[in-house]
Amino acid sequence: MKVRPSVKPMCEHCKVIKRKGRVMIICAANPKHKQRQG
């Protein structure tokens, strides 16, 4: 999980979701692409 000030999808499999008011990226194809904002 990367924590970054700005999160962007890294590949076509990355999905942008919101959990508890936080913007997150989850990726089924490459778990290294997981990110959280803040």
Swiss-Prot record:
Pfam short name (any one): Ribosomal_L36
InterPro entries referenced in this protein's UniProt entry, alphabetically: Ribosomal_bL36, Ribosomal_bL36_sp
Keywords, in A-Z order: Ribonucleoprotein, Ribosomal protein
One GO-annotated biological process of the protein: translation
The organism's place on the tree of life at top rank: Bacteria
GO molecular function: structural constituent of ribosome
SUPFAM superfamilies reported for this sequence: Ribosomal protein L36 (SSF57840)
Listed transmembrane segments: none
A single GO cellular-component term on record: cytoplasm
NCBIfam families associated with the record: rpmJ_bact
Family, as annotated: Belongs to the bacterial ribosomal protein bL36 family.
Name of the protein: Large ribosomal subunit protein bL36
